[in-house]
């Protein structure tokens, strides 16, 4: 069937590869197939419910009939609570007028791009990374892609940024990072900030400045000795050029509650508000009122995070240990030690091997298909995050992982690996 003539954007836009893969896996599970599904960056609410206090506040908020339109910038009491929350937990000073509320991170990221990036403007981002390629495409930006490697925890280096920074409009950094679960070091972040400040000092009064979109949606979920650093704490002058993306989606396992916030210069926040007022991507009034109260419950938040982080970290470390054990047995797999978020970065480098049935795994797509069919293991290749098609690394998300199934999953993976020649 021929497709109707639509806009250039509609004709060239690629849907989320992660959602597409996840939907295909979910369909197989619904049809009765046993699959260890580590594809979607979400949580099983039966394993990871939202905080009980937040749930009660949301229910009460609906009973209080908080169901009218919220203010376009977000209700004032929530913006005040966010201001207090980030001051208490991260040491950041942002007034309510420097805070924009929306229905999660996506509309905030989109409006950052729309507020800053013109057609042809250079957008710098590393790959693998989440959706920067799509947002750059939707705004007509010039893609300046940094291919990141395991040697640097799949994060951009100072040299990567330095050689591309001239003429750039936006740099996108996510730390802790989706999809890798790795973080940007203090020294690297500080040096990148220095490059941005130096570049902006060289631009004229009428020139567009270079901005940093800093996605820290996972910043509370760090493990072991890992520490999260942010640009404004490291270089206070960066406040003029930084837009933070944050929210409750991952920190409170509240992906479906849809409350996110951006922090940034009031002039940019005002334009994001104007864009969102036309898009209408507001967080629901009842949830905003509930989150405003919950963010002030310091003890409840600390207790929830203690449980939550222990459970996530246990899953990440258990699977990491399993992959390292397989590597030590001589199999072509590897894993990056868990640092943060809900993701484990694993390597499954089987291209060129032959299956027991005599089929050659000639591409990484063949490898992905093989481990799904033989080991019943579903993971997302880094190619879904903008990396090259031959990249042998994968994102493994543990938000729906049943701990007791991990040994069984690893056993099936080893059996599948053992069949290859």
Regions found by a protein language model. Give the residues of each.
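Conserved glycine-rich beta-strand-loop-beta hairpin in the small C-terminal domain of fold type I
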Residues: 292, 306-320, 332-355
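Generic structural signal for small/hydrophobic residues in well-ordered secondary structure
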Residues: 21, 38, 58, 82, ...
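Hydrophobic residues in well-ordered beta-strands that form the structural core
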Residues: 125, 145, 173, 212-214, ...
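Conserved core segment of the aminotransferase class I/II
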Residues: 55-56, 81, 234-313, 317-328, ...
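Conserved core of the PLP fold type I
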Residues: 60-207, 219-236, 362-363, 411, ...
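Short, surface-exposed loop/helix-turn segments at secondary-structure junctions
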Residues: 276, 353-365
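N-terminal small-domain helix-loop-helix segment of the aminotransferase-like
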Residues: 2-7, 11-104, 111, 295-297, ...
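PLP-dependent enzyme catalytic core of the Aspartate aminotransferase-like
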Residues: 84, 360-361, 370-379, 385-421
């Amino acid at each position: 069937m021929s497709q109707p003539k639509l806009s250039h954007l509609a004709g060239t836009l690629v849907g989320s590869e992660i959602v597409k893969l996840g939907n295909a896996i979910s369909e197989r599970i619904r049809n009765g197939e046993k699959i260890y599904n580590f594809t979607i960056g979400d949580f099983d609410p039966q394993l990871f419910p939202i905080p009980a206090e937040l749930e009660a506040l949301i229910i009460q908020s609906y009973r209080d009939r908080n169901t009218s339109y919220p203010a376009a910038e977000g209700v004032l009491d929530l913006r005040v609570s966010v201001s207090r929350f980030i001051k208490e937990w991260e040491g950041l000073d942002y007034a309510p007028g420097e805070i924009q509320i929306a229905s999660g991170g996506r509309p905030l990221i989109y409006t950052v791009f729309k507020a800053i990036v013109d057609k042809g403007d250079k957008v710098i981002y590393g790959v693998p990374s989440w959706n920067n390629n799509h947002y750059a495409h939707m705004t007509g930006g010039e893609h300046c892609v940094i291919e990141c490697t395991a040697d640097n925890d799949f994060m951009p280096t100072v040299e990567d940024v330095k050689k591309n920074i001239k003429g750039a409009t936006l740099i996108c950094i996510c730390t802790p990072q989706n999809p890798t679960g790795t973080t940007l070091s203090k020294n690297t972040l500080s040096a990148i900030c220095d490059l941005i400040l130096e570049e902006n000092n060289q631009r004229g009064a009428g020139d567009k400045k270079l901005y940093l979109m800093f996605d820290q949606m996972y910043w509370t979920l760090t493990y072991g000795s890992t520490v999260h650093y942010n640009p404004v704490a490291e270089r206070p002058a960066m406040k003029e050029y930084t837009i933070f993306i944050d929210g409750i989606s991952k920190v409170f396992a509240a992906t479906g509650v849809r409350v996110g916030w951006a922090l940034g210069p009031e002039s940019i926040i005002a334009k994001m508000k104007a864009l969102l007022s036309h898009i209408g991507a507001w967080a629901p009034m009842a949830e905003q009122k509930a989150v405003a109260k919950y963010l002030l419950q310091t003890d409840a938040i600390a207790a929830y995070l203690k449980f939550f982080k222990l459970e996530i970290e246990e899953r990440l470390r258990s699977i990491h240990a399993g992959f390292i054990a397989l590597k030590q047995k001589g199999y072509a797999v590897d894993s990056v030690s868990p640092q943060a978020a809900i993701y484990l970065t694993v390597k499954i480098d089987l291209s060129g091997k032959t299956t027991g049935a005599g089929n050659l795994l000639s591409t990484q797509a063949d490898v992905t298909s093989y481990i799904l069919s033989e080991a019943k293991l579903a993971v997302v290749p880094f190619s879904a995050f903008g990396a090259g098609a031959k990249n042998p690394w994968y994102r493994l998300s543990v938000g729906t992982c049943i701990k007791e199934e991990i040994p069984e999953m690893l056993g099936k993976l080893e059996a599948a690996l053992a069949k290859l020649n």
